[in-house]
Structure formats: C-alpha cells, structure tokens
UniProtKB/Swiss-Prot annotation:
GO terms for biological process: attachment of spindle microtubules to kinetochore; cell division; mitotic sister chromatid biorientation; protein transport along microtubule to mitotic spindle pole body. This is DASH complex subunit DAM1. Component of the DASH complex consisting of ASK1, DAD1, DAD2, DAD3, DAD4, DAM1, DUO1, HSK3, SPC19 and SPC34, with a stoichiometry of one copy of each subunit per complex. Multiple DASH complexes oligomerize to form a ring that encircles spindle microtubules and organizes the rod-like NDC80 complexes of the outer kinetochore. DASH complex oligomerization strengthens microtubule attachments. Within the complex, DAM1 and DUO1 may form the microtubule connections. On cytoplasmic microtubules, DASH complexes appear to form patches instead of rings. Residues 13-23 have a biased composition (Basic residues). Residues 227-237 have a biased composition (Pro residues). Residues 1-11, 262-273 have a biased composition (Polar residues). InterPro entries: DASH_Dam1 (IPR013962). Component of the DASH complex that connects microtubules with kinetochores and couples microtubule depolymerisation to chromosome movement; it is involved in retrieving kinetochores to the spindle poles before their re-orientation on the spindle in early mitosis and allows microtubule depolymerization to pull chromosomes apart and resist detachment during anaphase. Keywords: Cell cycle, Cell division, Centromere, Chromosome, Chromosome partition, Coiled coil, Cytoplasm, Cytoskeleton, Kinetochore, Microtubule, Mitosis, Nucleus. Residues 160-171 have a biased composition (Basic and acidic residues). It is found in: Nucleus; Cytoplasm, Cytoskeleton, Spindle; Chromosome, Centromere, Kinetochore. Residues 121-163 form a coiled coil.
Length: 294
C-alpha cells in the first residue's frame, strides 16, 4: 500500500471510539433513555423543506428581507443628504451669521447696557405699581379710621353734653359772696369742646369743702344757637371797709411784693434802731464767764 502524501492524524479512529466509550461509561448515559434507532425512509420527491407550508414561510421571509434592504437604503440616503447637504449648508449659514454679527452694527438692536437698563426699568415699573397699590390700600384704611374716629367723637360729645346737662339740673348754681359787697354770679361753663375721646378724666371729683373761699375757675363756654351768652361781670366793689363773716378780705391790694417795684423800699426807723442797738454789757459778761464747750 502506497503511503499517502497528505499527513494524517494517527489513531484518530481509536480516539473517537475511546471518547464514545467514555461517554457511554458515564452515569448520564445510563440515566437517559436510549434512542430507538428507527430510520424513516427518505423520499427524494417529498422533502421536509419543500413542503407547501414551509415554502410560503420562506417566501414571506424573503419579501420582508427585501423590504428591509430597501428601507435601509433609503435611510442611508437620507443620512447622507443631511450630513452632506444640510449640515454643511446650515453650518455655513450659521457661521456667516456670526461673522456678520461681529462685523456689522445693527442700530435697531439694543446693546448690552441698554438691555440691562430695560430690565432695570421693567423692575422699577413693577416696584412702582406695587407701591401704588400699597398707598391706595393705606389711604382706604386712613379714610376708614377717620370716619370711625369722627363717629366716636360725635358719640363722646353727645354723651358729655348729656352728662353736663344732667349735672347742671342736679346741682344748683351758687355764688361766693365776699364781705357785704355786691355778689358775683358764678356760672359753670360748658366744657364740651375741651373733652375728647382719649381724655382720662371724664367725671372729675368735686373739690373738698374748705373755709377759705377759693377763686372760681370758669372754663370758656361754647356758644350754640340754644345757649345764650353769659352777661358781662359787674365792676368790682370796694369791700376793704367791710368785714367778711366767712374769712379774711381777699379784695385788698397786694402788699407782699410792693417794695420790689416802687419807691417804698426804704429803711424805717424801727429797723434802723434795731440795727443800731448797743449790746447789753451784762449779756457779754455772762457769755465770757461760761466754761469752754467740751
């Protein structure tokens, strides 16, 4: 037997049979069911892949692949048109705009400073509108408080007038008589206009009784169409010669500060004698005879 010029692997059949024998000797070979080793007859006129159902499926698969190829071709053409035709043209257009922007001045467009000023003005307008709204609300509140205060003042004035009328009706009018001269009618004035809503004195207490007659303070009277004006006071009478049964005569001219303003501030004879008095010698002798103070 002539040797083959091609190299062959030695003992290849022996290795295959040994590997098959090792698989058969394993546990998996004993567990798995054995093949029945049934061989169906092969009909060359009726192959499995040439069945009508399989043929239709392969035809539909071929049509789908052709359609996919057409779609991919169209997508590739679109991509090339965008990358080559549109992107380059659009990029050149944007580049031209940027170059024109840097090289050409547009007088109608605001500059950066003008744009910042416009933004600042818009903020000021918003602030002004907000402040105007606050001022309007405060004015309404002020008007409401004024109306409320006016109503409170009217109510308090009516209450004080009613109180003063009831007080005048309840308390009879009296006059202070000094000496035996003509008397002066004392009229308690209406102090309605002197009172207000925030006054802490509404009903002043009556003064305590005293033997010394006090000067009467009459508040200015508010004249209305229903209140007649008081009569003028009578001229003061000379009551220096009459004595009062209630106390001292208070209608005398001032004597306490008379020497400060006229020429009566002169030393009198008794004061001069008092100042020129000679010390008593007996008193001096008694003072010298005393022991020293310890």
């Amino acid at each position: 037997m002539a040797s083959s010029p091609r190299p062959t692997t030695p003992n290849s059949q022996k290795k295959r049979s040994g590997r098959r024998q090792s698989h058969r000797s394993s546990g998996a070979y004993n567990i798995l069911p054995q093949s029945p080793k049934i061989h169906y007859p092969v009909d060359p006129d009726n192959l499995p892949l040439e069945a009508p159902g399989n043929t239709e499926k392969f035809e539909s698969l071929s049509d789908a692949l052709e359609e996919l190829d057409v779609n991919m071709t169209n997508l590739q053409s679109i991509h090339e048109a965008i990358s080559d035709g549109f992107n380059e043209s659009f990029a050149s257009f944007l580049y031209g705009l940027s170059i024109t922007m840097w090289c050409v001045d547009f007088p109608g467009c605001p500059s950066r400073n003008q744009w910042e000023k416009l933004k600042l003005v818009e903020g000021l307008d918003d602030r002004i509108s907000e402040l105007a709204e606050k001022i309007r609300s405060h004015r309404e509140e002020n008007e409401r408080l004024k109306n409320r205060l006016a109503s409170n003042v009217v109510e308090s004035t009516e209450e004080v007038e009613n109180h003063s009328d009831s007080h005048e009706n309840r308390k009879p009018q009296h006059s202070h008589r000094v000496g035996k001269g003509p008397t002066r009618q004392v009229d308690e004035g209406d102090d309605t206009y002197m009172t207000n809503e925030g006054s802490f004195v509404v009903n002043p207490s009556a003064p305590s009784a005293t033997r010394i007659p006090q000067p009467v303070k009459t508040a200015p009277r508010r004249f209305t169409k229903h209140t007649p004006p008081p009569p003028p006071p009578p001229p003061p009478a000379d009551t220096s010669m009459h004595s009062s049964y209630r106390g001292p005569n208070l209608n005398q001219p001032p004597r306490y500060m008379r020497g400060l303003f006229d020429s009566t501030n002169r030393p009198t004879t008794p004061s001069n004698n008092r100042s020129k008095r000679v010390a008593n010698p007996n008193r001096i002798q008694k003072a010298t005879g005393r022991p020293p103070f310890r």
